């Protein structure tokens, strides 16, 4: 599935989402590897098969398979870390923050791609998953690596757009299912 095919699936009630998707696809603020890896990581975080297929298709046309694999790794490891660290952050009992996580996360240290790209993808997925502690941690690493606040904001904006595409398509599918009854 292509991004154009995905746009066609976005219902009219979400016209702004469709326009944002078009703008995102043509945006050249981020380097290609950064951008297309972000598309894949954020798509995987939405858990929507159509969004994942479209973003992987556009990524395959623009980056190496290793980039796509690393982006999927970012989404997978953040699925775990975002749950765990959101709990640690939100729990009233602060003893959890002093306990070892005992979670394997070697991919963060050795992602197989540029470390800043992996951190940016991880931050975007953390924004989708709502882990403030993870967002702060990844932002700190990115800023120390010299990544601009504008690039960080762009990554989160793209993640927000990709999430809204998934929600819009799912809401439109629910409308179609109700109409068929």
From Swiss-Prot:
Keyword Calcium carried by entry: no
GO MF annotation, one: hydroperoxide reductase activity
EC number per UniProt: 1.11.1.28
Enzyme class label: oxidoreductase
InterPro entries named among the record's database cross-references: AhpD, AhpD-like, AhpD_core, CMD-like
GO biological process, one term: cell redox homeostasis
Disulfide bonds: 131-134
Catalysed reaction equations from the record: N(6)-[(R)-dihydrolipoyl]-L-lysyl-[lipoyl-carrier protein] + a hydroperoxide = N(6)-[(R)-lipoyl]-L-lysyl-[lipoyl-carrier protein] + an alcohol + H2O
Active site positions, chain numbering: 131, 134
Keywords, sorted A to Z: Antioxidant, Disulfide bond, Oxidoreductase, Peroxidase, Redox-active center
Similarity remark: Belongs to the AhpD family.
General function of this protein: Antioxidant protein with alkyl hydroperoxidase activity. Required for the reduction of the AhpC active site cysteine residues and for the regeneration of the AhpC enzyme activity.
Protein name listed in UniProt: Alkyl hydroperoxide reductase AhpD
Organism: Rhodopseudomonas palustris (strain BisB18)
Gene designation per UniProt: ahpD
